[in-house]
Design a protein with these regions (language model features):
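Nucleotidyltransferase catalytic core that binds NTPs
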Residues: 1-182
């Protein structure tokens, strides 16, 4: 008989979550599979989309996927090191498990070594790059609808976030060109 592992009190992740999608939802669920509470730190750096809109969409997608949001805490942070440190310090047992996506394996190892914490890697099932591609190429609207399970509200909010991101990218490029001319 296989024993279930005793979950950690807390799990922690850090990310931009600029355009939340199903892969992020799977990451949050994996956090809950390994801990009592999931502390999801969403970067509040200036180069990101609006924090409240990102969390609103991520929470909506989690709720739609029946993720237990009573155990999920969305927080702001400037860096992953601060995120992990705050989670560990506030934990009753001064421990946490770090959960990151497969594209962050080297960084996860670094955090693990620094804080002496275990790491769980969430395998990639979707990517922000893929989502941007489907949003930018309108001929893939059907694929985008499928990726958001036909949820028009989620698709609309994701498109707003993508437009915010593109506006920022275009503004930066225009500033670079202006700076190069001057």
């Amino acid at each position: 008989m296989k024993k279930q592992p005793i979950p950690y009190e807390r799990s922690v992740t850090f990310g931009r979550f600029n355009i939340p999608h199903s892969g992020h939802v799977e990451l949050v669920q994996m956090m809950l599979d390994h801990s009592e509470e999931a502390h999801v730190y969403v970067s509040d750096g200036a180069s990101n989309n609006d924090w409240d809109l990102r969390v609103l969409l991520l929470a909506h997608l989690c709720r739609s996927a029946n993720v237990d949001l009573n155990r999920v805490y969305f927080r702001k942070a400037k860096s992953p090191f601060i995120s992990v440190e705050q989670t560990i310090e506030s934990s009753p047992w001064q421990e946490a498990v770090i959960v990151l996506g497969s594209d962050q394996q080297d960084f996860a190892r670094s955090l693990s070594n620094h804080f002496d914490c275990p790491v769980v890697i969430n395998r990639r099932s979707n990517s922000s790059t893929q989502m941007r591609y489907f949003m930018d190429a309108e001929i893939f609207r059907e694929d985008l609808t499928h990726l958001y399970n036909g949820d028009e509200w989620a698709i609309t909010l994701a498109m707003i976030l993508r437009k915010e991101e593109r506006y920022r990218e275009e503004s930066c490029e225009a500033s670079r060109k202006t700076g190069a001319v001057a």
